[in-house]
Amino acid sequence: MYPDYISAKKMKENYEGNVFSPMGCRSFLSPWKDENGNYKWEGRFNQGVVSLNLPQIGILAEGDMERFWQILDERLSICFEALMCRHKALEGTSSDVSPVHWQYGAIARLGKGEKIDKYLHGGYSTLSLGYIGLYEVTKLMTGESQTTEEGQKFALKLMRRLRTATDTWKETTGLGFGLYGTPEESLCSRFAEIDQKKFGSITDVTDKGYYTNSYHVDVREKIDAFDKFTFESQFQTISTGGCISYV
């Protein structure tokens, strides 16, 4: 087992003074209060994740920045529809499907046959927009790594665009949408393989056989651990629905 560390100081800044552990390695819930105004973290859950293939958008844009943002908006609309499909599929679910979760206290103590709907609304549970390949899409659109001045400017603009989308969805639906750095142990290779077959070998993009995890620095880049943490931290304050950094 490898250890995961959290920064209590930074968590307090990002999560309204709260410190709590993630679900799995990186999934963080948005702050939520009960009817008495008390924060609650235990017993909450995620309804589903849909992940954006950022490098593919960059490939399709062919260096045209206006076209890039247009395709991104189109893909975001599809992601929203997919997440809402997941949400609607869960509505009307009976607590009987998993008594240990819904009746015996793992998540709730509902009656037999009672619907779980109240836990799907109001931000109690989350719906996550994931993303993969910030390094590769930055390389495609700027010709540089996201660690350069120009690359960083584009990468941050893109991340903020994604965060604005989830914030807007949350405001308009009342559901707990969040931005989430996808844990891509298999998806990193799957997306890359799909694009390699469709678009061929592209230097620093499809030729590696994988895409870089979320907002992470390219694993081939020469950078020390502390500089890597410092650089990636600026993306963590945007991707508050799920984030992690590795050394």
Residue ranges and their predicted role:
Residues 127-140, 160:
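Contiguous, well-ordered alpha-helical segments that form the cores/surfaces of helical PPI scaffolds
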